[in-house]
């Protein structure tokens, strides 16, 4: 009887909150890597939380951080005063997929969100309350959930007269086992749960740390061994492998050669 009641309650939760049963991280690739999270520094956490819930997130917490769960990635919110928005930093914006952009826009406008139609078919942009970034929304008619994380878009300037795009693409392939490819006209690299998109920036860009999008995170299987492998290859750890039993995770930090602050975690997939 108790087992039956538990199953009934689970089914009711899944029906009322459809994202609750689907908002999970992807299984790792052969290198043990998948998309983990995006960590945002916001002035008003409650306003940020309200925005992401209206977008379609399922809420939870990790310590003091509000966590907005989406299929493919988590959005973590931390109160603070960001040094600037995403434009001008290495990561220009993040993006999601929806099955129908027109229907999604109508829903978001009804919820009071700022949303603008994009220049390309099946594209729109959402603007969080602090207006320090824009979130790209792309239509994917084959999507079987209301919304899912899709991409992180990097902008990198040329270095010494040569394009940095092939170099950053190769770095993510080598470091995380990403698969090189294209997304439309852009060079890209795919990891489970995310497309990493690379575009030339005509102006210099600054590191992400301290800005509204402070860092991105990858979930790693056997993080301790992965960190040892990174160090053996010459990659410096900004924060060494650390166990956080109070949070139920382990973590480390690195910075890519273009200034992207990256958290490596093990355990966020249990949220």
Give short role names for the model-derived ranges.
Residues 1-5:
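Positively charged n-region of N-terminal signal peptides that target proteins for export
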Residues 6-18:
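Bacterial N-terminal signal peptides
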Residues 22-30, 33-43, 67, 83-107, 109-160, 181-200, ...:
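Vicinal oxygen chelate
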Residues 29-63:
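Mature N-terminal segment immediately following signal peptide/propeptide cleavage
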Residues 48-53, 108, 132, 168-173, ...:
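Conserved active-site tyrosine of GNAT-family acetyltransferases
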Residues 53-60, 112-113, 173-180, 234-236:
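Conserved acetyl-CoA-binding loop of GNAT-fold acetyltransferases
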Residues 58-65, 179-184, 242:
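Conserved catalytic-core motifs of GNAT/GCN5-like acyltransferases
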């Amino acid at each position: 009887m108790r087992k039956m009641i538990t199953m009934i309650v689970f089914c009711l939760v899944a029906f009322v909150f459809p994202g609750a049963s689907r908002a999970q991280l992807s299984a790792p690739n052969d290198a043990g890597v998948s998309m983990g999270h995006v960590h945002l520094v916001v002035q008003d956490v409650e306003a940020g939380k309200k925005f992401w819930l209206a977008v379609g997130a399922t809420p939870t917490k990790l310590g003091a951080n509000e966590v907005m769960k989406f299929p493919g990635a988590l959005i973590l919110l931390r109160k603070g005063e960001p040094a600037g928005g995403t434009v001008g930093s290495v990561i220009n914006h993040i993006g999601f997929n929806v099955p129908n952009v027109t229907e999604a826009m109508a829903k978001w406008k009804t919820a009071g969100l700022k949303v603008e139609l994009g220049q390309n078919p099946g594209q729109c942009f959402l603007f969080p309350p602090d207006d320090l970034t824009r979130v790209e929304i792309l239509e994917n008619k084959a999507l079987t959930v209301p919304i899912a994380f899709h991409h992180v878009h990097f902008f990198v300037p040329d270095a010494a007269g040569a394009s940095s795009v092939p170099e950053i693409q190769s770095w993510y392939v080598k470091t995380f086992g990403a698969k090189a490819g294209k997304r439309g006209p852009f060079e890209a690299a795919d990891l489970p749960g995310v497309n990493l998109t690379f575009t030339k920036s005509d102006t210099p860009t600054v590191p992400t740390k301290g800005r509204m999008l402070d860092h991105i995170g990858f979930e790693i299987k056997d993080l301790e061994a992965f960190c040892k492998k990174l160090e053996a290859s010459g990659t410096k750890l900004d924060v060494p492998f650390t166990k956080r039993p109070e949070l139920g995770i382990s973590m480390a930090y690195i910075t890519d050669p273009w200034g992207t602050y990256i958290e490596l975690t093990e355990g966020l997939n249990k949220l």
